[in-house]
């Protein structure tokens, strides 16, 4: 543990282009693991990016990640990383989420979480989905630090773990664990 938080070090915040939160987050993960040759644009070209057009349901904006999408991406570029997905319905409550985050950070596993962005910040009507990297947890396990690719509110943000748990549930997502 370092200071008041257990933190995973990420070298650089990559600011997301609109609807590129997944590519920007993956660029940060790749840089953390020593892969500097791919940008969010390169990553986006390999993933299906759906623009925020009026005729498209906002739930469908951005990258549509399915089973093995990330592993297929790693395989295509000969990147020696592996993604294991933990759906939120496999985690009972925020206490179990805290235990899982601590365990994964202790194992030096990068944790990307998918969640309902608006829900996390109090708007329970919106369906805007987003991803960030969980980089730390407070010593009392009540707060987590997210590295958010933005573009809005990019950078390190501390949120309550119970709010994050609820936002992950609202987004029907989970933890993308990369090692």
What does each of the following model-derived ranges do?
Residues 1-73, 117, 125, 140-141:
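Active-site-adjacent structural segments surrounding the nucleophilic cysteine of cysteine proteases
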Residues 47-50, 108, 171:
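Alpha-helix boundary/capping residues
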Residues 44-47, 111, 132, 144:
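A broad, low-specificity signal marking well-ordered, structured residues that form hydrophobic/aromatic
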Residues 57-137, 176-177:
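Predominantly the structural core of cysteine protease catalytic domains
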Residues 1, 106, 116, 121-128, ...:
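Noncatalytic regulatory segments and standalone regulatory/sensor domains
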Residues 26, 98, 131, 143-144:
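Hydrophobic, well-ordered secondary-structure segments
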Residues 43-44, 101, 164:
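Generic structural signal of hydrophobic/aromatic residues within well-ordered alpha-helices
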Residues 1, 38, 92, 96, ...:
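Short coil/turn linker and secondary-structure boundary residues
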């Amino acid at each position: 543990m370092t200071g008041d938080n257990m933190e995973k070090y990420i070298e650089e915040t990559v600011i997301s282009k609109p609807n590129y939160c997944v590519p920007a987050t993956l660029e940060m993960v790749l840089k953390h693991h020593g892969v500097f040759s791919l940008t969010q644009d390169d990553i986006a070209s390999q993933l299906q990016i759906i623009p925020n057009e009026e005729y498209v349901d906002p739930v469908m904006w951005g990258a549509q990640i399915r089973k093995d999408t990330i592993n297929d991406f790693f395989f295509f570029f000969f990147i020696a990383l592996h993604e294991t997905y933990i759906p939120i319905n496999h985690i009972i409550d925020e206490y179990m989420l805290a235990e899982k985050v601590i365990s994964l950070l202790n194992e030096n596993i990068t944790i990307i979480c998918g969640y309902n962005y608006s829900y996390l910040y109090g708007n329970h009507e919106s369906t805007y989905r987003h991803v960030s990297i969980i980089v730390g947890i407070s010593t009392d396990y009540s707060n987590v630090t997210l590295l958010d690719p933005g573009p809005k509110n990019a950078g390190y943000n501390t949120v309550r773990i119970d709010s994050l748990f609820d936002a992950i549930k609202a987004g029907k997502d989970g933890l993308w664990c990369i090692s």
